[in-house]
Design a protein with these regions (language model features):
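Membrane-embedded transport module
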Residues: 100, 105-187
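Conserved ATP-binding TGD loop and adjacent catalytic N/P-domain core of P-type ATPases
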Residues: 1-128
Length: 187
């Protein structure tokens, strides 16, 4: 297959995210290396038969790598299933789309970097929100239960506890809304 027009920018965007890009292809080594050099791809694994792709993914995982596989065909389905994150191109086959963890709606390679950015940001926000909730509960519940009443005279009245719980929920929702900043700017 010929490289898509946005492929060099997509590889650069993945590099900016700290991702090592590997081309896993059935093409011959010389052709694959030529295309990889044009696109800035880090590693090439060429001459791989369709049934061997998932074994190559498993070998990368055995080396301690977290692997995201992008594919669109029937031949890619086992590798998409083997990968830590399977990413199907939306214009791909039904089996690839069914097997993947993420389905890109367009056939634009730049969307891979966008999906990874949104995924990483979502995990970061989940951890932050969990931290807010645990922190709030670790402080507010003992106070509301009157644990500090004998020693410090500190206790929350029920209506103040309910109000502060609402405030905690508002902080969590506002923090989650910051995910919108991760979307790429329209061009």
């Amino acid at each position: 297959d010929a490289a898509r027009e946005t492929a060099p920018a997509a590889v650069a965007a993945l590099h900016d995210l700290g991702v090592r890009v590997v081309m896993l292809t059935g093409d011959n080594q010389a052709t694959a290396e030529r295309i990889a050099a044009q696109l800035g791809i880090d590693d090439v694994i060429a001459g791989v038969l369709p049934e061997g792709k998932s074994a190559q993914i498993a070998a990368l995982q055995k080396d301690g790598r977290v692997v995201a596989m992008v594919g669109d065909g029937v031949n890619d389905a086992p590798a998409l299933a083997q990968a830590d994150v399977g990413i199907a191109i939306g214009a791909g086959t039904d089996v690839a789309i069914e097997t993947a963890d993420v389905v890109l709606m367009r056939s634009d390679p730049l969307d891979v970097a966008t999906a990874l950015t949104i995924g990483r940001g979502t995990l970061r926000k989940m951890r932050q929100n969990l931290g807010w909730a645990v922190g709030y509960n670790a402080i507010a519940l003992p106070i509301a239960a009157g644990v500090f009443m004998p020693a410090f005279g500190l206790m929350l009245r029920p209506e103040i506890a309910a109000l502060s719980m609402s405030g905690s929920s508002i902080i969590v929702v506002a923090n989650a809304l910051l995910l919108k900043r991760l979307l790429p700017k329209p061009q």
